[in-house]
């Protein structure tokens, strides 16, 4: 038996070494047939002696039992997006902003992979979990699917790595794998994937990991995330950290390069763009990062992106097609947007059949008519956009595009405020289109966060005339909800209960939920902190609004206009009458800010306090409420089923209290 255990260990190590040579070094050392022979021998031994199977065995990539749904995972550190530049002038301006603060620097450049961003965590060198980026704070647990990707090591190489390592990178589908996948689908008469990115995303989000295992996905790391202990010595440059990842067996693109000047970055960009079609994977630009970690730390971040990095996007791909007609859509704030119906055309990796014309000014600028041949571009390889008319191809029967004087949905008057490009329906919540979008926004996760109130549910509620305004949501009964498709009494009762829970919110969330133009989460929070009460907000004028942080003349005008409309005030009053409420925001004297300067973290389920209430009350006492535990955390509040944050706090020696202790502090 000892000999069998030894052979299994040797085969596992040998196959993992071959995987490293193949996927990381790009220098396979044995033929595929020999690899298959070794793998089959290992499978046979493990089948007979499963007790000797190792966690990093390549046989563990075949996939396991199908999941019912993906669990949500909170990232140890936010996964931010990148700002973009689209030409040399914009990149030069980006470089100037950096060097004005840091002096001379170098950049680490790499292809911008067009796949799905993921976070992979290793503990003691062993693959522990993986998650999608999601909204940057929370992603989906795709551990079992990522485990099937052959290029991702299940155990890090060597022994010189931290206790905990978070690897961030992109899951991609190589062109060869994409073509083979579509060939199989075509042979079976199944729907084809449009591009490798969609194929990678669809494959990674399969509830059955065996399907993911069959899709030949790849992975390239582009950064380190959280590392514990924090004192562990990492390389002092981004390139050096990528080399550390490579030494641990993690795949890193061979195209990564350090550039010491703007000219070298431009040269690198042009070279990658020229070779774009010959690369084995899809890319849509180049990512440029300040190489020195010390400079990255000093430059910091804006709300959702680092100041020290940017994506230098390739010029959008363009094609010609026919403009067959124009539809007019109405959005949440009443904006009437012309949408061009196009003869379907394949551009930038997708088939495009619609494109926005933005507004009447854009139609006039283009001089476009129905029947024209137009040039379509995917701006930033994302948003289809009409950029020009091919005038010489205009037919004799081309028709002018007439902007409607009345709303195409509710027949209310369409008005255009002087100085604004957008025309808007004046129907407000009387307009079904605005009503649907307004209520979807009201129920969304960052607003009142009504669990289970998805877009399709909202649309049915309005179509069946069960809801006319946000306040009507709080009058719904379970029996009425059963009128909706696929809504039994059990689901209806659960949804009504979720609506009732949502009545307890915060002033900031309530303001955001109202859907006031240009008032996002941050502005809503600033308004709540400044005015503290709804009555004070209602009584304010434009001059007062401008005194609030981040509120300029435009937002102030939108606020004043919103609060001057009787039907908006009626909606607000009805919401309050329906029981929507939030904890009072009281003026706190400086000496009463007992938690000023402290950083607190909440984890687990709070049974007596709403999490938003707890966060708001801690902030009123001067505390900063963070989303993750670090050595700078002063206190962790651990509710029921506390997980990794609690373990990390205990490891770092951070003070931990329960909900009862929190209530005592807040009272």
From Swiss-Prot:
Instruction: Summarize the protein's role.
Output: DNA ligase that catalyzes the formation of phosphodiester linkages between 5'-phosphoryl and 3'-hydroxyl groups in double-stranded DNA using NAD as a coenzyme and as the energy source for the reaction. It is essential for DNA replication and repair of damaged DNA.
Q: Which organism is it from?
A: Shewanella halifaxensis (strain HAW-EB4)
Among PANTHER family, the record links this protein to: CHROMOSOME TRANSMISSION FIDELITY FACTOR 18, DNA LIGASE
| Name of the top EC class for this enzyme | ligase
| GO BP annotations, alphabetical order | DNA repair; DNA replication
UniProt catalytic activity = NAD(+) + (deoxyribonucleotide)n-3'-hydroxyl + 5'-phospho-(deoxyribonucleotide)m = (deoxyribonucleotide)n+m + AMP + beta-nicotinamide D-nucleotide
Provide a GO CC annotation, any one. cytosol
Name recorded for this polypeptide: DNA ligase
